[in-house]
Amino acid sequence: TKSPHVATSPRTKEIAEFIAASWKAQGLDTVTIHRYDVLSSNPRTVAVEMVAPVRYTPTLREAPIPEDPDTAQPGISGAWTSFSASGDVTAPGVYANSGNPSDYDELRRQGIDPKGKIVIVRYSNPYSYRGFKALTAEREGAAAMIVYSDPKEDGYGQGAVYPKGPWGPASHLQRGGIAYDYIVPGDPLTPGWASVDGAKRIPVSEAVSVPKIMALPMSHQDIQPILAALGGPMAPAAWKGGLPIDYRLGGAEARLHVRIDMQTDVQPNYVVEGRITGSERPDEWVVLGNHHDAWVFGGVDPSSGTATMLELTKALGTLAKN
């Protein structure tokens, strides 16, 4: 966790080598690092601006916290979503609650067509995976999707915010991927087979798990002026979040400009495999796994799991040796 380690970055190979060395020292029977060449998605440019009724440019970054010097480290990325499409669009903003299909049904009942709009959705209320929100927005014909963490679910509406408590501070961003891997799991270009060197790869345009909609996360601090300017009908009571504004559906008054340029190409990624062969049932498997890449430092996700896994393999290695 000493530095950011996004998937396919050079730092992730260092972490794979650290895990492999730890397992060898712990006494696992075999330890192997496997290289897979996978489709990688990283941002070159992510920009948002409100151009009407007033001009406003959000920071799209997390503010450093004086009590936590690590939040000021270089290399911390701003707002971005892996596997967002690239594009440049100016369109009206629309608030679509959690971005689930029933929310778009409600928008239409209110006379608002999401097609061609930039939809703003919440991470919760109720929860759904950001990739499902993106697919739903894409199917609805939206031009882009902004997903933000409302303080009602992750912020001062729940209690004290970091560093005084566990909840998200005002500028906190929830980065993540939106690949439709719940439809086709694994590397998008090798559906159903391993993404090893020399493997057949389909074109990105044919990969059903690669979104065709632009998407990015924002903090509730950044999104508040935009939500406050939306205008249009009042949102249903169940859609109201924790910001001190009138939650409206938008549709015409507020116009947003979103420009995203993603670098999408095939890059190496590393998987570490360690084995302890059973003495009584060597042909039966118990599989334990955890990813080791992270959106930033990964103190919670994934490194809490990595630390737990390393302690477990240490215990299992000791048992195997004895």
Indicate where each model-derived feature is located.
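Short, surface-exposed beta-edge/turn micro-motifs
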Residues: 91, 115-118, 142, 213
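Noncatalytic luminal/extracellular "stalk/propeptide" segments of secretory-pathway proteins
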Residues: 2-115, 125, 163-165, 169-185, ...
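Catalytic-core environment of secreted peptidases
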Residues: 1-11, 20-26, 30, 50-51, ...
